[in-house]
């Protein structure tokens, strides 16, 4: 029985992970759950899965959780604060750690788990976007194992030879006969919206993804295709890919989750229903397979598969992310921080949809920073970028 800690249990990835565990009660057991402030949902999860530990981001939320679990049979130990999160992420008993805390807040607990040589199921994008090289250096140093959870990176991983799977972040694609990684994306809900109407798009419209069920922040990122841009940055670190070894393709049906192009002309793809439980189950059971609970793909229900070149006028955030990846880790860290702040402002109706790309570019072009040499450097760059973004938004509002 594998013991699993879930960082970000009340979010979309966390709940999907618990669904996979529910489908495989003889294979996986929940050791610890970590969440932000959603005490109500955490209480439901604690009652259902009886973890040994539950950690909330602050004392108030932990107090609410204690009240909700009072007079129940749940014996979960309740903790709070960032130190507790880092401590729980590094528990000796854990066989696997699902890293699904959104944002740069997930970086330190993920590194704490790596330093204990854990098997990391990585859904937290920021770990690579802000510290990709530092991240994989730590993985190698401490003998940890990382498996990607994003559907695209997981699809690529499944399509790669074991020589690369066993040496993520360092192996040469060319040496294994690979010419390029083909990263697919749906194009989001505004794929066919006239360009002159984009500035009027609302948060609810941006969050209405045609294929995937996701949280609101990542749904907005999908609408701008910043999500694909961040995945592009991640993929370069995950698979040690150069700019010339990366391709981005819009695939509206989200059936082909990504592909790998080989020297001999072969293209290997991973396909299936757009359900995050598939990559989660794959990574949890690797190198074996287990039940995910996802519906099997019915080829006879598929009308057509489309492939479209990205339009960078429609998706300026995608273009900006690719540019940032060429500049280096400082630039991608700035972009990630700026985007988190400006998307939050959009969701709170402080800026327009089209302001997201404009503000992101202003912030990225404002900074000319040296490359980070430590996690503290990364966090300092992140802090500076957030402050600059907030100042620009304040001028607009």
Swiss-Prot record:
Transmembrane segments: none
UniProt cofactor(s): Mg(2+); Mn(2+)
Top-rank EC class of the record's enzyme: oxidoreductase
Listed EC numbers: 1.1.1.267
Recorded catalytic activity of this chain's protein: 2-C-methyl-D-erythritol 4-phosphate + NADP(+) = 1-deoxy-D-xylulose 5-phosphate + NADPH + H(+)
Chain residues that bind Mn(2+): 150, 152, 231
Keyword Manganese: yes
Binding annotation for NADPH: 10-13, 36-38, 124, 126, 215
GO MF, one annotated term: 1-deoxy-D-xylulose-5-phosphate reductoisomerase activity
Family membership: Belongs to the DXR family.
Quaternary structure note: Homodimer.
Protein name: 1-deoxy-D-xylulose 5-phosphate reductoisomerase
């Amino acid at each position: 029985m594998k013991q699993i800690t879930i960082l970000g249990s009340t979010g979309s990835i966390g709940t999907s992970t618990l669904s996979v565990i529910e489908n495989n009660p003889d294979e996986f057991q929940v050791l610890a759950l970590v969440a932000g402030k959603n005490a109500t949902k955490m209480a439901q999860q604690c009652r259902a899965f009886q973890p040994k530990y539950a950690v909330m981001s602050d004392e108030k939320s932990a107090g609410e959780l204690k009240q909700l679990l009072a007079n129940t049979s749940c014996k979960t130990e309740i903790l709070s604060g960032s130190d507790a999160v880092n401590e729980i992420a590094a528990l000796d008993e854990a066989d696997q750690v699902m890293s699904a805390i959104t944002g740069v807040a997930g970086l330190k607990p993920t590194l704490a788990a790596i330093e204990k040589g854990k098997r990391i199921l990585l859904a937290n994008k920021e770990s690579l976007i802000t510290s990709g090289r530092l991240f994989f250096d730590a993985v190698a140093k401490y003998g940890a194992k990382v498996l990607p959870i994003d559907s695209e990176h997981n699809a690529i991983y499944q399509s790669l030879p074991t020589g690369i799977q066993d040496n993520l972040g360092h192996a040469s694609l060319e040496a294994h006969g690979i010419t390029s990684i083909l990263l697919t994306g749906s194009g989001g809900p505004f794929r066919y919206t006239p360009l002159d109407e984009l500035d009027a798009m609302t948060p609810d419209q941006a969050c209405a993804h045609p294929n995937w069920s996701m949280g609101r922040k990542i749904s907005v990122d999908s609408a701008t295709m910043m999500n694909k841009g961040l995945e592009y940055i991640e993929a370069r670190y995950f698979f040690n890919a150069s700019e010339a070894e990366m391709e981005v393709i819009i695939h509206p049906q989200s059936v082909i989750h990504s592909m790998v192009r080989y020297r001999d002309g072969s293209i290997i793809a991973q396909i299936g229903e757009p359900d995050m439980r598939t990559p989660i189950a794959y990574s949890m059971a690797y190198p074996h397979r287990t039940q995910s609970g996802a519906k099997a793909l019915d080829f006879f229900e598929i009308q057509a598969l489309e492939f479209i070149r990205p339009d960078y006028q429609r998706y300026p955030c995608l273009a900006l992310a690719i540019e940032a990846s060429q500049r280096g880790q400082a630039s991608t860290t700035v972009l990630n921080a700026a985007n988190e702040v400006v998307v939050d402002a959009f969701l709170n109706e402080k800026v327009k949809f089209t302001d997201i790309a404009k503000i992101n570019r202003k912030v990225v072009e404002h900074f000319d920073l040296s490359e980070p040499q430590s996690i503290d450097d990364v966090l300092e760059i992140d802090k500076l970028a957030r402050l600059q973004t907030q100042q620009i938004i304040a001028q607009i509002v």
